[in-house]
From Swiss-Prot:
SUPFAM superfamilies named in the record: Actin-like ATPase domain (SSF53067)
Gene that this polypeptide is encoded by: act26
Keyword Secreted: no
Lineage: superkingdom: Eukaryota
Catalytic activity: ATP + H2O = ADP + phosphate + H(+)
Keyword terms: ATP-binding, Cytoplasm, Cytoskeleton, Hydrolase, Nucleotide-binding
Name recorded for this polypeptide: Putative actin-26
Job of this protein: Actins are highly conserved proteins that are involved in various types of cell motility and are ubiquitously expressed in all eukaryotic cells. Multiple isoforms are involved in various cellular functions such as cytoskeleton structure, cell mobility, chromosome movement and muscle contraction.
GO molecular function, one term: ATP binding
Organism: Dictyostelium discoideum (Social amoeba)
Cellular compartment(s): Cytoplasm, Cytoskeleton
Disulfide-bonded cysteines: none
Protein family membership: Belongs to the actin family.
Pfam families (alphabetical): Actin
Amino acid sequence: MEDNITSIVIDCGSGMCKAGIGGEEFPRVSFPSIVGKPRFEKTMCAIGNKEYYVGDEAQSQRGMLSLKYPIKNGIVVNWEYMEKLLFHMFYNELRVSPDQYPILFTESPLNPKSNREMLTQIMFEKFNVPALYIAIQAVLSLYASGRTCGIVLDSGDDVTHTVPIYGGYVLQHSIIRLNFAGSDLTEYMAKLLLERGYSFTTTSEMEIVKSIKEKLAYVAINFNAEMSKPIDTLETTYQLPDGQIIIIGNERFRCAEALFQPSMIGLECDGIHETIFKSIMMCDIDIRKHMYANILLSGGNTMLSGISDRIYNQLRELAPNNMKILIVASPERKNLVWIGGSILTTLPLFQEMWISKEEYDEHGPSIINKKVGLY
């Protein structure tokens, strides 16, 4: 690979793993965070005699594999499979030798210290990296927008967080986590389409539903007003991979409405607007105005059309009358965490934050907890 690589930035979420070169604009690779093992020995022969498959390859062979998701709700739950995912990412996707470059990893807010230490141990002992840093995803999103204060609504595949940050520091006591995100909307869309007579049940069919959601779903500015519109004004068509054309109507915004009314899918939790409001109210009274004026959307699940206007309207009803509210919705918010990490690795002040192999050898995995959180 090129000689001008200074560092590698890795953002692994529950749904997708993104990786690339520090200082570049976008991640070079992105693949599903899944690992598959052949169900039977005969299957191994049929699909190439591999012990396991990762990412897109696992997705394409899923009928013959037992699929595992190493990351659940933003937290690594299976380290054996996480190692396989990382090996695949370095050697098959990025095609780099990890012992040559410092590695910046992103992590979910509220990630247990023990998990952080385990990742540190794996990176130094299994992959022999020369240096490592682990940064909190929401902070990186904020950096990518040129801010050090604000509240980040980060919603990906299966977890949503509201994370207040002030002066670059995460306000841990004000974080709220919802185990509810994009995959829940995909399942709800499948249920709504079933009511229309279209059945999607298999893993591959659910990928089609995900594509329908990403292309056609939107957030209604006013849900009741949208529901009262004539049906034919809402309907559009979608061509399935087999050529069949289906009609989709109010499912497009009913699906996304679950973000604001989780009870629609049977969840007893607050909507995203209420979660933002509660997170802000848990902050010190003197900094709440900074939070309201810097509400940053991050993650693939915030890419829905109309979401920022709807959040603004809902918060306008909850916030004090004279409060300035600003929703920041970057067109790149799907990759905002990775972009923030890429920016961070280029800052001169950050270079002293890397944890070196020498430091690790001297202090062990706990060294990571002494430095993480400063950026």
